[in-house]
Amino acid sequence: ETLLARLARARSVLVLTGAGMSAESGIPTFRDAQTGIWSRFSPQELATPEAFARDPGRVWQWYEERRKAVRSAQPHAGHRALVQLETMVPDLTVVTQNVDGLHQLAGSGKVWELHGNILRSRCHLTQRPIGSDWLADSPHSPPRSPYVEGGLARPDVVWFGEVLPTAAVEAAAAAASRCDFCFSIGTTSLVQPAASLPLVALEHGAALVEINPAETPLSPYASLSIRGKASEVLVTLVSEFAAWTRHNDA
């Protein structure tokens, strides 16, 4: 049975995406974002609760610069191909390690963000969301919380040493357990718990296709491991699947 036939038979599809998916939209990876004045800081000095407690202004400013890059980015053809694929299968879940919201911007319906979203903010004390209007009106950097004295706005992302959002982790685990077909796209397959999701899918009998420019620890386990850019590979794959479906439905 070909992989296209397995995809056609799949009742549920899981798509796991990492930094490589966003890099093609011009969003620098976490490491690449440390350019210019930021190159002298380690990630631990910019993306930990301790760093924020020590120098909230510096951390907020770094994230402001990263937000600018995210706001000017657009989904690429690979994001749009996943939206098209969603219309061709009964159930498709995107689980992403990216914090840029590009899957939602492209039109994906079911997206779980394991590491949060850089365009959202929340109070660092109450964890309640803070709206963009409040942030825009604030003269402070970071803006003060509207909820509690001493509270500050912080990016709604997962910093080093923090726990991942429970709802997203549980939804991702459930999607991995129930899927018949899993894609791992643009991820190094090193960061947990995301790295284990394709292995959970395999254990439950799913087919696994990896799309990444370089080999990863996941590559030996994949039914098919494709070296290439997510945008190009996904467009080809989805159009081939569409053609296969038309031919076999005829």
Name each model feature, range by range.
Residues E1-A250:
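Conserved catalytic core of sirtuin-type NAD+-dependent deacylases
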